[in-house]
């Protein structure tokens, strides 16, 4: 799986040598620059300070940890931006609580659906990087990350063992004998 994913990533990076319109890093660099300019001109209240990217792989690799932080954890700091900021912070807290509970009720590694897990995690990682690299505004970032949330929760649900979860009585498919 990792070999296939790496192969496609390399093809995407070197697609610009085949056709000049396919320079992925340059396109992402332009998107980030345009987004910062638009947010600054509009006076966005949730603009986060980000380091400006350059259209080379080293710049993107250096900013990858910050991009992941921006996508996954910066909505926690958005509570000061009004009711929508509070809702995005509560959403993040709910995800963290759910993930910690799913880890508590995990199943053995041999029983985990690994292809589904790898797909979900790679999709979330790639989308989170693109969002984090290009989006310095928390409000837009919260909207752009919506497609990755179901896959993130599905990835963590691959670890959950339904037999270990203490379901309430009304939610059980096979009620316990009385």
Positions of predicted regions on the chain:
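A juxtamembrane structural motif centered on a specific transmembrane helix
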Residues: 154-178
């Amino acid at each position: 799986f990792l070999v296939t994913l790496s192969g496609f990533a390399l093809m995407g990076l070197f697609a610009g040598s085949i056709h000049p319109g396919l320079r992925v890093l340059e396109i992402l660099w332009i998107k980030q620059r345009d987004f910062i300019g638009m947010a600054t001109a509009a006076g966005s209240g949730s603009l986060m300070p980000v380091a400006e990217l350059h259209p080379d792989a080293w710049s993107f690799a250096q900013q990858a940890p910050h991009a992941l932080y921006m996508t996954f954890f910066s909505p926690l700091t958005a509570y000061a931006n009004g009711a929508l900021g509070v809702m995005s912070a509560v959403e993040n807290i709910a995800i963290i609580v759910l993930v910690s509970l799913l880890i508590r009720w995990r199943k053995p590694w041999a029983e985990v659906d690994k292809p589904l897990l790898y797909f979900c995690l790679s999709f979330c990682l790639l989308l989170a990087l693109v969002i984090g690299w290009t989006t310095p505004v928390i409000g837009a970032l919260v909207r752009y990350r919506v497609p990755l949330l179901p896959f993130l929760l599905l990835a963590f649900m691959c670890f959950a063992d339904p037999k270990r979860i203490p379901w309430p009585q009304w939610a059980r498919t096979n009620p316990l004998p009385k």
